[in-house]
Structure formats: C-alpha cells, structure tokens
Amino acid sequence: MIKLESLFDISERKRRKKLLGRGPSSGHGKTSGRGHKGDGSRSGYKRRFGYEGGGVPLYRRVPTRGFSHKRFDKCVEEITTGRLAELFQEGEAITLDALKAKKAIARQAVRVKVILKGDLEKTFVWQDTAVVLSQGVQNLLGIT
C-alpha cells in the first residue's frame, strides 16, 4: 500500500525539454546551441566515430600491434624458358644482373626461378646461384 509520506515531489524530477531557436533570452536562441559556422552548425552533421575535435585520435596515437614480415621478405621472380630464348643470344650467360639489365625481372629481385614453358633450343651458361632451375628445366637439360 502506498502511503502519503512515501510519495516524492515529481515537479523537481521533471526536466523541461530544451527549446531551441526561441529568442536570445532563452539561452538557446539564434544559433540554437550550435555555434557559428563550421561542420557542427550544418544540418545533418554527425561527428565521425573516434573524432576528437581535430586532435590526433586515440586509434592513431596507440601503436599498431603485431609484426609484419613484409619488409624482410625476399623478392623471388619467375621467368619462362621461352622468354629467355627471346631475350638472350646463344651461349650467353644468364645472371641476375643480366636479367635486371634487360628489365625481365624487378630491380629488387634477389632470386629468379626458371620455369619450363616454351622451347629452349638455345644453349645458355648458368653461372649465377641466384638463378634457380625448376625440376622440368633440369630434366630437359639432363641435370639431376
């Protein structure tokens, strides 16, 4: 049962709705609490998640987690026997530098793998350890 002394004054707990744009004496007149100019004064404006008023946001201040091996990965290119036949003359030495000079591989490449595709009727000198022959090319040349 509700007693009279247990009732509380509801008038103190009711908060009036903020009326905007109702004259200068209301405290929320003219710019309606939005300030002058800028994004926030425009209709439809919403702050981006994580926005901190133009300062560097937390998600950019905190260092990234984990480790990426991408910086240290070795660049390995591949080239076909048909492409080698186009680029090099009979008996020419195939080295990493020679392939880079002919722009057949990327400059940052540290190793090249020769893949059997196309004909290999010319003979070449394989003297660079960075140029690796695939199993198919080794079988074709009789190297085992």
Swiss-Prot record:
This protein's record includes keyword rRNA-binding: yes
Record GO cellular component, one term: cytosolic large ribosomal subunit
Keywords annotated in UniProt: Ribonucleoprotein, Ribosomal protein, RNA-binding, rRNA-binding
Keyword Ribosomal protein (UniProt): yes
Region Disordered: start-end pairs: 18-49
GO biological process, one term: translation
Residue stretches spanning the membrane: none
Family matches, as InterPro entries: Ribosomal_uL15, Ribosomal_uL15/eL18_sf, Ribosomal_uL15_bac-type
Molecular function terms from GO: rRNA binding; structural constituent of ribosome
Family: Belongs to the universal ribosomal protein uL15 family.
Subunit structure: Part of the 50S ribosomal subunit.
Job of this protein: Binds to the 23S rRNA.
Name of the protein described by the UniProt record: Large ribosomal subunit protein uL15
Organism, as annotated: Chlamydia pneumoniae
Gene field: rplO
